[in-house]
UniProtKB/Swiss-Prot annotation:
SMART domains: Ribosomal_L2 (SM01383), Ribosomal_L2_C (SM01382). One of its GO terms (biological process) is cytoplasmic translation. This is Large ribosomal subunit protein uL2. One of the primary rRNA binding proteins. Required for association of the 30S and 50S subunits to form the 70S ribosome, for tRNA binding and peptide bond formation. It has been suggested to have peptidyltransferase activity; this is somewhat controversial. Makes several contacts with the 16S rRNA in the 70S ribosome. GO terms for cellular component: large ribosomal subunit. The keyword Transport does not apply. It comes from Pasteurella multocida (strain Pm70). NCBIfam families: rplB_bact. Belongs to the universal ribosomal protein uL2 family. Keywords: Ribonucleoprotein, Ribosomal protein, RNA-binding, rRNA-binding.
Length: 273
């Protein structure tokens, strides 16, 4: 994998930094594992904007990813690594011994030709998925389940990982990248290693149009709007003279947004700011 800085042949290329991975498949994706993905423009069924700054962008197909890793005790060979427009991580197409193909998140260090396996008796090896009761304390894992059988929900983006720091009774304690420490049932499945493509954070798009290709529209500051459009709008100069709020008047910048008291007991330590 290489980090390439483009030559300044135009204003739009001047600051571009690309991530080039020669291992990625250059052809089309595996058609049986594709699904349609329709654009909403951030609108709901009434046509009202429910998510701002979304619209346009290139057409995409959704890749059906196996987050559950529930094909147990059947070895699979990695056929190829692929780009996925729906996520920052790359994906791997694997062929199981019984002939079935699936997409999985591509961990760091996994290459075409490698063998992976899921199940309680799988060896501790990058790309293998096991219940966390069978994974040694101190191991680095990704694609971690919060509920047994539901599929991985934690540490799925490029370069993400979680460390198992303790095992006590039916629970393991995880340290997340944010600094949060939380308990998860030891029966939950996790995949060994960290998610690949960690250089994703180093890329520079270089121009506004590159964000538009991705379906991301401009974000306008409230203080640049009129009073009718935003609580920060209007006035002389740039100072809006009040506590910062959202366009709907809800306090922001530091306001707590978590409301799930039911799972508070599983959080051993809050994330660091």
């Amino acid at each position: 994998m290489a980090i390439v800085k483009c030559k300044p042949t135009s204003a739009g290329r001047r600051h571009v930094v690309k991530i080039v991975n020669p291992e990625l498949h250059k052809g089309k994706p595996y058609a049986p594992l594709l699904d349609t993905k329709s654009k909403t423009g951030g609108r709901n069924n009434f046509g009202r904007i429910t998510t701002r700054h979304i619209g346009g962008g290139h057409k995409q197909h959704y890749r059906l990813i196996d987050f559950k890793r529930n094909k147990l005790d059947i070895p699979a060979v990695v056929e190829r690594l692929e780009y996925d427009p729906n996520r920052s991580a790359n994906i791997a197409l694997v062929l199981y011994k019984d002939g079935e193909r699936r997409y999985i998140l591509a961990p760091k260090g996994l290459s075409a030709g490698d063998t992976i396996q899921s199940g309680a008796n799988a060896p501790i090896k990058v790309g293998n998925a096991l219940p966390m009761r069978n994974i040694p304390v101190g191991s680095t894992v990704h694609n971690v389940e919060l509920k047994p059988g539901k599929g991985g929900q934690i540490a799925r983006s490029a370069g993400a990982y979680v460390q198992i720091i303790a095992r006590e009774g039916n629970y393991v304690t995880l340290r997340l990248r944010s600094g949060e420490m939380r308990k998860v049932l030891a029966e939950c499945t996790a995949t060994i290693g960290e998610v690949g493509n960690s250089e994703h954070m180093l890329r520079v798009l270089g121009k506004a149009g590159a964000n538009r290709w991705r379906g991301i529209r401009p974000t306008v500051r409230g203080t640049a709007m009129n009073p009718v459009d935003h609580p920060h709008g209007g006035g002389e100069g740039r100072n809006f003279g009040k506590h910062p709020v959202t366009p709907w008047g809800v306090q922001t910048k530091g306001k707590k947004t978590r409301h799930n008291k039911r799972t508070d007991k599983f959080i051993v330590r809050r994330r660091g700011k």
